[in-house]
Curated annotation (Swiss-Prot):
Residues 150-264 form the C-type lectin domain. Its main location: membrane. This is C-type lectin domain family 12 member B. GO terms for cellular component: external side of plasma membrane; protein-containing complex. The chain crosses the membrane at residues 44-64. A motif (ITIM motif) lies at residues 5-10. Residues 1-43 are cytoplasmic. N-glycosylated. It is a single-pass type II membrane protein. It comes from Homo sapiens (Human). The keyword Disulfide bond applies.
């Protein structure tokens, strides 16, 4: 009888323990439910996103580092290029400075040579004038025979016949010259000093141009008022015709009048070899 009770008790206890275990498991299951599949996917996506962001940041960092290195390299190249350009500019400036110095030296030498040649020409002219005055044994003849030499011009005073202004002009052209033109007071004084002009009338290359309503020299230039006295200006402004020289003054007459005339042409240069 006691064995049966014991068996029953053990059986009861085992059954109660198993039940207690099952109840404990059920309680644990109810207290800590299993994770939901949706949250698991969300967590996985978040981790993946973090990894992608991390990879992106690393990639951007590497790109930034590479770009920084490239910029630094380009900056060094640019700095070197600027130094090279500056050096070339300095060299060019120095060369230009040397060229300017050479140009200044060249101009100085040219001016010196020009000055020497001018003095030599003046001395040759003076010597030639002395030879013409004092001797006939020379080859210095800047003007043809019967022509008078003054400064850079030769003058021919016609006294063997009288002609109108137009015919006198033609005769000068035939002599490869023109009717005289007064360019300066010195030239006017030279003409006034000629004895022939004290007693005779001589045509000048000054005439009234009716088409232009003005006075012109043979070369087309307008006479300068500073070359004429007040009396002469009154003559010129109050008359129309052709100008002539007489007794050191300029007068106006009919161009058809027949008087003497003066031709003028450029003198030949004086050659030093003709002074021997």
């Amino acid at each position: 009888m006691s064995e049966e009770v014991t068996y029953a008790t053990l059986t009861f206890q085992d059954s109660a323990g198993a039940r207690n275990n099952r109840d404990g498991n059920n309680l644990r299951k109810r207290g800590h439910p299993a994770p939901s599949p949706i949250w698991r996917h969300a967590a996985l996506g978040l981790v993946t996103l973090c990894l992608m962001l991390l990879i992106g940041l690393v990639t951007l960092g590497m790109m930034f580092l590479q770009i920084s290195n490239d910029i630094n390299s380009d900056s060094e190249k640019l700095s070197q290029l600027q130094k090279t350009i500056q050096q070339q500019q300095d060299n060019l400036s120095q060369q230009l400075g040397n060229s300017n110095n050479l140009s200044m030296e060249e101009e100085f030498l040219k001016s010196q040579i020009s000055s020497v040649l001018k003095r030599q020409e003046q001395m040759a002219i003076k010597l030639c004038q002395e030879l013409i005055i004092h001797t006939s044994d020379h080859r210095c003849n800047p003007c043809p025979k019967m022509w008078q030499w003054y400064q850079n011009s030769c003058y021919y005073f016609t006294t063997n016949e009288e002609k109108t202004w137009a015919n006198s002009r033609k005769d000068c052209i035939d002599k490869n010259s023109t009717l005289v033109k007064i360019d300066s007071l010195e030239e006017k004084d030279f003409l006034m000093s000629q004895p022939l002009l004290m007693f005779s009338f001589f045509w000048l290359g000054l005439s009234w141009d009716s088409s232009g309503r003005s006075w012109f020299w043979e070369d087309g230039s307008v006479p300068s008022p500073s070359l004429f006295s007040t009396k002469e200006l009154d003559q010129i402004n109050g008359s129309k015709g052709c100008a002539y020289f007489q007794k050191g003054n300029i007068y106006i007459s009919r161009c058809s009048a027949e008087i003497f005339w003066i031709c003028e042409k450029t003198a030949a240069p004086v050659k030093t070899e003709d002074l021997d």
